[in-house]
Regions:
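A contiguous, well-structured "functional interface" segment within a domain
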Residues: 1, 60, 120
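N-terminal, charge-rich interaction modules
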Residues: 1-18
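Feature captures the catalytic cores and cofactor-binding loops of soluble hydro-lyases/lyases
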Residues: 22-23, 27, 31-46, 51-115
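Short, low-complexity, charge-dense intrinsically disordered segments
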Residues: 118-124
Length: 124
C-alpha cells in the first residue's frame, strides 16, 4: 500500500514529505513506547503513535521506518518536522485514535509488523 493511499484511508494531513507519498508501505506498527519500537519496527514499516517528540523521528530514522503517523490530531514541534524533512521521513497527522487507525489500515490490506522476539532475546 502506498503512503498516499494511507493518507486517504486515515483522513490524514501531510506535515512533511509530500514528495515521498509514493513510498510503498509493507506493514505498520502502533506503539507509544520507544523501547518497543526499537525491538519490533523493521524497515519499510509505518509507525503509528501519539508521541510527538523529536525522539520519535530519530527512532524512525534508526529503524528505517518509512513514515510516522501521529494520532489524535497531535502534531510534532518545528524541530521534529525539520529533522524529519532532513531525514526523508514523511510525517502525517490524523484525528483518529490508534485503534481506529490500525483497524482502517488492516481492513484496507495493510498487515501488522511481524517481527517478534522471545523473552530470552529480550532478557539476555
Amino acid at each position: 500500500m502506498k503512503l498516499s493511499e494511507i493518507q486517504k484511508v486515515l483522513d490524514a494531513e501531510v506535515l512533511c514529505g509530500n514528495n515521498l507519498l509514493q513510498r510503498e508501505i509493507r506493514s505498520c506498527f502502533a506503539c507509544d513506547l520507544i523501547s518497543e519500537m526499537l525491538l519490533y519496527v523493521t524497515p519499510d514499516t509505518l509507525v503509528i503513535t501519539s508521541l510527538t517528540n523529536i525522539h520519535i523521528v530519530h527512532t524512525a530514522r534508526v529503524m528505517d521506518a518509512v513514515g510516522v503517523v501521529f494520532v489524535g490530531g497531535k502534531k510534532p514541534d518545528a524541530a521534529a518536522i525539520m529533522t524529519s524533512e532532513m531525514s526523508d521521513i514523511p510525517l502525517l497527522t490524523t484525528n483518529h485514535l490508534i485503534f481506529e487507525c490500525c483497524g482502517r489500515l488492516f481492513v484496507n490490506g495493510l498487515k501488522p509488523n511481524k517481527k517478534t522476539t522471545d523473552s530470552a532475546d529480550v532478557c539476555g
